[in-house]
């Protein structure tokens, strides 16, 4: 949103649905994400960096769950090794601090001035053919069947 009237209208609309709302600062930057997988022995594996590039300013439901020509999803390969390592370490740290189990997709913004901003964690990320989590894990050389076996093994261990 770029004007006070847009903010007022959005807050008014939100209050129609609930009396508690969250207003966040808009962060301009690239939307990047890391798949984190916990092996049975507790080792955390962090994937390469995935990126969502949308023509629109907002990554909508339709773009996430339907075939969209407006959005490109893939491996981000233009960041330095140092930045990639820092993002992966932050993803694993978020996973640990929140005491996650099994898997999560950790999303960040990477701003034009090089700031890494935690956005959200998805403790049950999508597994559709369009979903980033399985693509990122398979890019690490872990097959889909290995991924499922790792998750089942971890669940049995924790049970």
Task: Locate the predicted segments by residue.
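Cysteine/selenocysteine-centered motifs that mediate thiol-based redox chemistry or coordinate metal-sulfur cofactors
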Residues: 147-159
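A long amphipathic alpha-helix within ATP-dependent nucleotide-binding catalytic cores
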Residues: 11-20, 65-111
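Short, charged, low-complexity patches
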Residues: 84, 141-148
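Oxyanion-binding "anion nests"
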Residues: 26-91
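Active-site nucleotide/adenylate-binding loops and adjacent lid/helix of ATP-dependent enzymes
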Residues: 1-30, 40-41
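Flexible, glycine-rich terminal cap/loop adjacent to redox cofactors
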Residues: 122-144, 156
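Conserved metal-phosphate-binding beta-hairpin within the catalytic cores
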Residues: 25, 36, 95-127, 137
């Amino acid at each position: 949103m770029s004007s006070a009237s847009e903010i007022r209208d959005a807050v008014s609309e939100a209050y129609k649905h609930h009396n508690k709302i969250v207003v966040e600062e808009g962060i301009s930057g690239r939307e990047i994400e890391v798949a984190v997988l916990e092996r049975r022995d507790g080792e955390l594996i962090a994937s390469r960096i995935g990126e969502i590039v949308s023509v629109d300013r907002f990554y909508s439901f339709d773009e996430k769950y339907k075939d969209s020509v407006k959005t490109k999803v893939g491996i981000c390969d233009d960041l330095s090794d140092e930045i990639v390592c820092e993002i992966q370490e932050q993803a694993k740290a978020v996973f640990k601090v929140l005491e996650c189990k099994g898997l999560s997709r950790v999303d960040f913004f990477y701003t034009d001035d090089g700031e890494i901003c935690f956005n959200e964690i998805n403790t049950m990320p999508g597994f559709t053919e369009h979903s980033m989590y399985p693509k990122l894990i398979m890019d690490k050389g872990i097959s889909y069947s290995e991924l499922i076996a790792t998750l089942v093994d971890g669940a049995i261990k924790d049970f």
